[in-house]
Amino acid sequence: PGVLRLTGAAKEDIPMYRIQTMNKISPVGLNRFPSELYEVGDAVQDPQGILVRSAKLLDLEFNPGLLAIARAGVGVNNIPLDRCAAAGIPVFSTPGANANAVKELVICAMLMGSRDIPGAIRWVREQAASGADVSTVVEKGKSAFIGPELYKKTLGIIGLGAIGSIVANTAISLGMDVYGYDPFLSVDTALRLDRHVHVVKDINDLYKRSDYITMHIHYTEKTAHMINASAIAAMKRGVRVINLARGEIVDDEAMLTALDTGMVAAYITDFPNNRLLTAPHVIAMPHLGASTPESEQNCAAMAVDTLRDYLESGNIRSSVNLPEMTMDRSGVQRLCVLHKNVPGMLANITSLFGRDGVNVENLSNKSRGDYAYTMVDLGSKVGDNVIEDVRRTANVCLLYTSDA
């Protein structure tokens, strides 16, 4: 178990936080670190926080003082989540920070898939390269690129989170009929959805209705090859499938077979590979979903803010491996305890404060899987003996304390 003590008595008494950057992070985000409180850079040693984009941390040996990792982006396949949770290290991501960039690319993907715009551009260039008078051949050749409009077509969206929800609302504004599937739909997201979006409980209802299907879900063991031969067989013939989520969500062999038979009219993906690039009716891009300056800036700013909020106040926002919990400050001292999610832990912890005659001003506790997080604001400071007793309590992974 580790202990981080912050005095908070005066600015000069607060130790500098050390933040290591594992990738180039936008200055828009880095400038949100107060220079008097934070040392930030790629050469920082023994960091208390790590900022990362795509660098692989799977085999990284964490220093004992590491308290948190923030990913400036959404996917966290490059971070060992279970190992971090066991060590009491929350991993933060930035859901929604790149949502608009991805949304715009989804609309672009539907248009490209409908009218084969990349193929049309390629054809024009081929005509010019062959010496043809392009101005005279285009009228005859353009008929090969006729495709449907989006208006009054049906879009199916798998995953109605930060990205899927704004894709849905934008598609409604384009005159599309929208069906969404998300078994984990939150109340907040549901309230943001346009009232004309149809939310279905059975994904097959979405498959059979949709002219276009787009996925906005995390890659997990359960979502691996979610779009397989069985799923494709349930879809409307001639569907156009867009995958800007993760390549592994789609079974490439099943998709290629469906493209060959015409079951799928086009597959537009942000995750190219050599096999896909040789197939007709595939539009493959080099993972451009979040590749806008605005998106990179938003992700960096959100990553820095969540990291600071945890280090300075113990609040956990947008964590992918530990309970989500925030609590307004009250009292004189705050203790945050990450522990195993087992019976009796809350009673064990609070009894130690009562034994020392310290009143609990506010308390919150939440669990996620095998772990739970307890935040306690106390009416007076506890002695070092109490802090040490909490730290040594069985099943405690991390104890964080700071003064108000």
Please identify what each model-predicted range represents.
Residues 58-60, 183-276, 291:
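Rossmann-like adenosine-cofactor binding region
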Residues 164-165:
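N-terminal Rossmann-fold NAD(P) dinucleotide-binding loop
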